[in-house]
UniProtKB/Swiss-Prot annotation:
Cofactor(s) needed for function: Fe cation
NCBIfam families: iron-sulfur cluster assembly accessory protein, IscA, PRK09502.1
Amino-acid positions noted as binding Fe cation in the UniProt annotation, renumbered to this chain: C35, C99, C101
Keywords for this protein: Iron, Metal-binding
BP terms from Gene Ontology: iron-sulfur cluster assembly
Similarity remark: Belongs to the HesB/IscA family.
Protein name: Iron-binding protein IscA
One Pfam family in the UniProt entry: Fe-S_biosyn
CC cofactor note: Binds 2 iron ions per dimer. The dimer may bind additional iron ions.
GO MF assignments: 2 iron, 2 sulfur cluster binding; iron ion binding
Function comment: Is able to transfer iron-sulfur clusters to apo-ferredoxin. Multiple cycles of [2Fe2S] cluster formation and transfer are observed, suggesting that IscA acts catalytically. Recruits intracellular free iron so as to provide iron for the assembly of transient iron-sulfur cluster in IscU in the presence of IscS, L-cysteine and the thioredoxin reductase system TrxA/TrxB.
Organism the protein comes from: Klebsiella pneumoniae (strain 342)
GO cellular component, one term: cytosol
Highest taxon in the source lineage: Bacteria
Length: 107
Protein backbone atom coordinates (compact mmCIF):
# COMPACT_ATOMS: atom_id res chain seq x y z
CA UNK A 1 0.00 0.00 0.00
CA UNK A 2 1.30 3.43 -0.82
CA UNK A 3 0.50 7.09 -1.34
CA UNK A 4 3.13 9.21 -3.08
CA UNK A 5 3.66 12.92 -3.69
CA UNK A 6 5.43 14.71 -6.50
CA UNK A 7 8.15 17.18 -5.55
CA UNK A 8 5.80 20.09 -6.28
CA UNK A 9 2.99 18.61 -4.14
CA UNK A 10 5.36 18.00 -1.22
CA UNK A 11 6.72 21.55 -1.47
CA UNK A 12 3.20 23.02 -1.54
CA UNK A 13 1.99 20.98 1.46
CA UNK A 14 5.12 21.86 3.45
CA UNK A 15 4.58 25.53 2.59
CA UNK A 16 0.96 25.38 3.78
CA UNK A 17 1.98 23.64 7.01
CA UNK A 18 4.73 26.19 7.66
CA UNK A 19 2.31 29.10 7.10
CA UNK A 20 -0.24 27.41 9.35
CA UNK A 21 2.34 27.12 12.11
CA UNK A 22 1.25 23.68 13.27
CA UNK A 23 0.04 20.35 11.97
CA UNK A 24 0.98 16.71 11.78
CA UNK A 25 0.35 16.38 8.08
CA UNK A 26 -2.27 16.17 5.36
CA UNK A 27 -5.44 14.08 5.53
CA UNK A 28 -6.47 12.54 2.23
CA UNK A 29 -9.89 10.96 2.01
CA UNK A 30 -12.98 10.43 -0.10
CA UNK A 31 -16.60 11.42 0.39
CA UNK A 32 -19.80 10.69 -1.48
CA UNK A 33 -20.31 13.48 -3.99
CA UNK A 34 -20.88 14.44 -7.60
CA UNK A 35 -22.31 12.58 -10.52
CA UNK A 36 -19.76 9.73 -10.43
CA UNK A 37 -20.06 8.94 -6.75
CA UNK A 38 -16.90 10.01 -4.89
CA UNK A 39 -14.77 13.12 -4.50
CA UNK A 40 -11.38 13.69 -2.90
CA UNK A 41 -11.06 15.46 0.44
CA UNK A 42 -7.86 17.24 1.52
CA UNK A 43 -7.46 18.83 4.94
CA UNK A 44 -4.78 19.43 7.51
CA UNK A 45 -4.61 17.12 10.50
CA UNK A 46 -3.07 18.00 13.84
CA UNK A 47 -3.15 14.48 15.24
CA UNK A 48 -4.03 11.20 13.50
CA UNK A 49 -6.68 8.93 14.98
CA UNK A 50 -5.74 5.46 16.19
CA UNK A 51 -7.46 3.82 13.21
CA UNK A 52 -5.72 6.02 10.61
CA UNK A 53 -2.91 4.81 8.36
CA UNK A 54 0.02 7.21 7.98
CA UNK A 55 2.25 7.29 4.90
CA UNK A 56 5.30 9.50 4.58
CA UNK A 57 6.80 10.67 1.30
CA UNK A 58 9.29 13.48 0.71
CA UNK A 59 8.94 14.63 4.32
CA UNK A 60 5.13 14.90 4.20
CA UNK A 61 2.91 12.72 6.38
CA UNK A 62 -0.30 11.70 4.60
CA UNK A 63 -3.07 10.43 6.89
CA UNK A 64 -5.86 8.21 5.52
CA UNK A 65 -8.82 6.67 7.32
CA UNK A 66 -9.49 2.96 6.85
CA UNK A 67 -12.61 3.44 4.73
CA UNK A 68 -10.86 5.74 2.25
CA UNK A 69 -7.68 3.67 1.99
CA UNK A 70 -9.27 0.99 -0.20
CA UNK A 71 -10.15 3.67 -2.78
CA UNK A 72 -6.85 5.59 -2.57
CA UNK A 73 -4.15 2.92 -2.43
CA UNK A 74 -1.50 3.69 -5.03
CA UNK A 75 -2.59 7.31 -5.56
CA UNK A 76 -0.02 9.96 -6.49
CA UNK A 77 -0.69 13.54 -5.45
CA UNK A 78 0.75 16.27 -7.66
CA UNK A 79 0.50 20.07 -7.62
CA UNK A 80 0.15 21.55 -11.09
CA UNK A 81 -0.17 24.98 -12.67
CA UNK A 82 -2.16 25.22 -15.90
CA UNK A 83 -2.44 28.76 -17.21
CA UNK A 84 -3.90 30.90 -14.44
CA UNK A 85 -5.16 27.86 -12.51
CA UNK A 86 -3.23 25.82 -10.00
CA UNK A 87 -4.18 22.98 -7.71
CA UNK A 88 -3.68 19.44 -6.57
CA UNK A 89 -4.07 16.66 -9.13
CA UNK A 90 -4.73 13.03 -8.22
CA UNK A 91 -3.47 10.08 -10.24
CA UNK A 92 -5.43 7.17 -8.80
CA UNK A 93 -4.99 3.70 -10.35
CA UNK A 94 -8.30 2.55 -8.82
CA UNK A 95 -10.48 5.01 -10.77
CA UNK A 96 -12.69 3.32 -13.35
CA UNK A 97 -14.64 6.39 -14.49
CA UNK A 98 -14.68 10.16 -13.94
CA UNK A 99 -17.45 12.66 -14.48
CA UNK A 100 -17.08 15.15 -17.31
CA UNK A 101 -16.33 18.06 -14.99
CA UNK A 102 -13.55 16.10 -13.25
CA UNK A 103 -14.96 16.71 -9.77
CA UNK A 104 -15.90 13.13 -8.93
CA UNK A 105 -14.93 9.56 -9.76
CA UNK A 106 -16.03 5.95 -9.50
CA UNK A 107 -13.98 2.87 -8.61
Amino acid sequence: MSITLSDSAAARVNSFLANRGKGFGLRLGVRTSGCSGMAYVLEFVDEPAAEDTVFEDKGVKVVIDGKSLQFLDGTQLDFVKEGLNEGFKFTNPNVKDECGCGESFNV
